[in-house]
């Protein structure tokens, strides 16, 4: 789980060399194999009826994108043909050099989930801690504005013994949400999503 945390906090520089074929949907369909089905529009979206293999998708990177609440000067996207994730910026496009309008890309936007989704993880963690005094302090820390900052301070500064447990809960839930998002977009099948959820339950809390 520590490796997962490091993966999710990797800097934007890892995406600077990402390049995706600038292929229109019409051109792609014209070159499609017999196994390719028609696309159905939704959002940016053109979603293939055939599914991606979840094992080839960077679930942790999608989780990072879903949690990214920063701004709209950069956006995360996924290629529905390959499952590869890319970072687009308004100044440097996808390749870090050439600006391109995001609407011109045959990629699917990964919009961040609302902050209350991630807030619930903190609340559940505080509620699940066995030591009642520690649990109360954590619960108090997530009340009102500044909850994320106060909770982080409580865990990292005052209860470092809980850091690994917090990372474990936070990361596994983030990964499950990433898989649920892929399912909602029609990129993976229900069986794969259900199996992932079964294989990645919430960890026990101290």
Q: PLM features: what roles do these ranges have?
A:
Residues 20, 35, 39, 46-47:
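Aromatic (phenylalanine/tyrosine) cluster motif
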Residues 118-183:
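Amphipathic protein-protein interaction modules
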Residues 45, 55-144:
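The feature represents the first ordered module of a protein
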Residues 166-206:
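Acidic, proline/glycine-rich low-complexity IDRs
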Residues 16-18, 25, 36:
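Short hydrophobic alpha-helical segments enriched in small aliphatic residues
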